[in-house]
Amino acid sequence: MFNTLLAVFIGGGVGSMARWLVSLKLNSASAHLPVGTLIVNLVGAFIIGLTLAFFSRMTHIDPVWKLLITTGFCGGLTTFSTFSVEVVYLIQEGKLAWAAGTILLNVAGSLAMTMLAFILVNNFASQ
């Protein structure tokens, strides 16, 4: 149990620091679209897709590694709460089209990235 908690703790810390750095560098790139939040959510969705597809085929690997990457790193990297508050700010500023676009890009984009990761792993594994 301690190893599992430690793995999630380490992964979460690294993921959170990565999110902060990406947001720090990219969120100021656009006055309307929180680019940093979008990037971390898309990258996190892709990484979790890769990880889950990989671990579903490699069942002999200790599942603590999966938790380090998925619950820890991806949980720390991605952010639904920041995404939500950024959308609320856009709505409060009357930027309804930007709010809708942000929702669409984050939700549909994250789903597409996760699906793409599964497809890539499955195609690579079948060759």
UniProtKB/Swiss-Prot annotation:
Its main location: membrane. Keywords: Cell inner membrane, Cell membrane, Ion channel, Ion transport, Membrane, Metal-binding, Sodium, Transmembrane, Transmembrane helix, Transport. It comes from the Bacteria. One of its GO terms (cellular component) is plasma membrane. GO terms for molecular function: fluoride channel activity; fluoride transmembrane transporter activity; metal ion binding. It holds the Pfam family CRCB. The keyword Repeat does not apply. It is found in: Cell inner membrane. It catalyses: fluoride(in) = fluoride(out). Signal peptide: none annotated. InterPro entries: FluC. Na(+) is not transported, but it plays an essential structural role and its presence is essential for fluoride channel function. GO terms for biological process: cellular detoxification of fluoride; fluoride transmembrane transport. The chain crosses the membrane at residues 4-24, 35-55, 71-91, 101-121. It is a multi-pass membrane protein. Na(+) binds at residues 75, 78. Belongs to the fluoride channel Fluc/FEX (TC 1.A.43) family. HAMAP family: FluC (MF_00454). NCBIfam families: crcB, PRK14196.1. Fluoride-specific ion channel. Important for reducing fluoride concentration in the cell, thus reducing its toxicity. This is Fluoride-specific ion channel FluC 1. It comes from Yersinia pestis.
